[in-house]
Amino acid sequence: AILVAPDDGVVARLISKLVYLWRVQCEDRLASLWRAEESGQARDGDAFGGLVSRWLCVNGQVRKQKNGLVLTPQGRLNAEVIVRSHRLWETWLGRHVDLPVDHLHPPAEWIEHHLGEQVRKRIENELGNEDVDPHGSVIPREKK
């Protein structure tokens, strides 16, 4: 029973953890591609070989081109939510926690996968119309 209990069994928890890790990998890949586009960097031409990249392609988040992967419109929207969450959280931390700017990234890298729309809205309201994060990067606007 402890192994296969539907919600609290070892197997259920393992599956839940694997699903979470997969989602984080996919979101990180989307955000990475978005940041590459933002900075004008060359796309990773070998990126299509990875399982995550293939999954994103099959699910319509990215397309393969000669020079690598590009975000589809839906992939771009999803990536912007992740990058926006990250940069909003860095900005909030920069205002409220006594951390050097170079220490803001690691906690934001984790929390970006957990900020829901309601929490993002609360942070936005508290920050006002903040356009730039503490590193000087533009915070993407939310698309309606």
Can you describe what each PLM-predicted range is?
Residues 1-32, 117-138:
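Membrane-interfacial segments at transmembrane helix termini in multi-pass membrane proteins
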Residues 33-37:
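Short helix-to-turn junction characteristic of helix-turn-helix DNA-binding domains
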Residues 39-144:
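Structured cytosolic domains appended to multi-pass membrane proteins
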